Design a protein with these regions (language model features):
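Glycine-rich phosphate-binding loops of nucleotide-dependent enzymes
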Residues: 2-243
Length: 243
């Protein structure tokens, strides 16, 4: 039986010349849930996610994924274990069609099996709602549809853990609603770590919320529990009426 938590960190710390970006962060990520990581600019979210994904090595502490200590593994090795991290750096090929972009991503695991490769590409396009745009050149997509395509590229790799970094940033209100529905659908098949500033999106999607403050873990719980936490209200959210 799989462990309840797909990922855990212990004492995770990152220092830059004596300045601590993260300090002794003990964090757990429940399997097949959406966990939101929130906090203001400078709270240490990007550094923490960098250490989880392998883009940044910790000064001390450990990261365990599926029970394996991956603290020293680079990002590409973590991808091979089942992590996908999107929106920080786009991997879209603008001159290729939507279908070709997804096919390239799916081919990282399925290039040896032509039928499975084609089936996976079609299934991903259907799941994320881009089947009717499969022949469209990526550079011609709207901003919102490009964001959806970026999700498709991660989904095509069958991630066990999908890290979504500010997926609703820059989207119109209607596009945000569509993204919320999409994330709920994704959570049926994978674990999601969501880095998000939009509190409405967090409230509508997250099963669990973790709050960072000045590099430390400040609070963790359901959205309602975090919202009611006076320290969180003071540090990030204002009064409950403003959330």
């Amino acid at each position: 039986m799989a462990a309840v938590n797909i990922l855990e960190t212990k004492g995770l710390t990152k220092s830059y010349g004596g300045v601590h970006a993260n300090i002794d962060v003990d964090f757990v990520l429940p399997r097949n849930k959406i966990t939101a990581l929130i906090g203001p600019n400078g709270a240490g979210k990007s550094t923490f996610v960098g250490m989880v994904s392998g883009r940044t090595l910790p000064t001390r502490g450990t990261v365990h994924f599926e029970g394996q200590d991956i603290s020293g593994l680079p990002a590409h090795k973590r991808m091979q274990l089942g992590m996908a991290y999107t929106f920080q750096i786009t991997s879209i090929f603008p001159g290729l069609s939507v279908e070709d972009n997804v096919s390239l991503a799916a081919g990282r695991k399925l290039a040896h099996d032509k039928a499975a490769h084609a089936a996976k590409t079609a299934a991903v396009l259907e799941k994320i709602g881009l089947s009717d745009r499969s022949d469209q050149i990526a550079s011609d997509l709207s901003y919102g549809h490009r964001r959806v395509l970026e999700i498709a590229l991660g989904l095509a790799q069958d991630p066990k853990l999908f890290i979504l970094d500010e997926p609703t940033q820059g989207l119109a209100e209607g596009e945000v609603d569509a993204f919320v529905a999409l994330m709920r659908g994704l959570a049926e098949d994978t674990t999601i770590l969501l880095i998000e500033h939009n509190m409405r999106v967090v409230a509508d999607t997250a099963d669990h919320v973790t709050v960072l403050d000045q590099g430390r873990l400040l609070a963790s719980g359901s959205f309602d529990e975090v919202q009611a936490n006076t320290a969180v209200q003071s540090a990030y959210l204002g009064t409950p009426a403003n959330v």
